[in-house]
Amino acid sequence: MGKRSSTLRVLLLGGTTEASALARLLAADGRFEPTLSLAGVTRAPRPQPIPWRIGGFGGVEGLRRYLAEAGIEALVDATHPFAAQMTRHAIAAAGTLKLLRVERPAWTPCPADHWLPVPDMQAAAQALGPAPRRVLLTIGQKELAPFRETPGHHYIIRSVDPPEPALVPPGAEIITATGPFSLQEERALLARHAIQVIVTKNSGGSATAAKLAAARERGIPVVVMQRPSAPAVERVADAAAAMEWLGAVWERGQGGAAPLEPRLG
């Protein structure tokens, strides 16, 4: 048998810092023919160094059809840790394709932190209690609805794009900003708005972690939505490890014997 094509067609499901880093690595490596797929949550995504598309696939069947029609040979899911449905769709659609999940480690509290873990945003809204508080919401636009049901607090909402007005709690302030945020910036934000509690998701990573350190310094409690249960799929923590995995897939396709060590989580 002869060798197959010298390049490996890769579909990268993105929208995260890790996906952007991996896209840059793939752009510089001639072994791969990558395509980046973005869900379209951000209204004006930054230009990417590899071919890219925006929008959904139409569920599992749509993704399966795309993979077949595009001749994809390896699928890398580097979506947000809370994009559980997309990860499930990727697993269901992959079939016999090589599939890798890139997922940054979750944050873990320090002894001085005052964290309140909750399973969802409904529980987070209830955890704020009845006494009026100044609350910083850094949770994304789709999770705001429960806080409309607890309007007694003053909300400061930080998001990449302005949320839809129908989702915003009455009287809330909107801050549009894109990370990474420095510790100095987060200190200033908490002081300027007299923040008394933060609500966030356990997204992990360094881009928005400084708010946790700033909260620790000021003794501010943080309501933290825990990650959904992770399906069993091969996974790595960053772009560099994903490139190693893709390199091994490419090598095996060329008749090499590079091992693929499963790391199920």
Residue spans for each PLM region:
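SAM-dependent methyltransferases
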Residues: 2-77, 84, 94, 99-102, ...
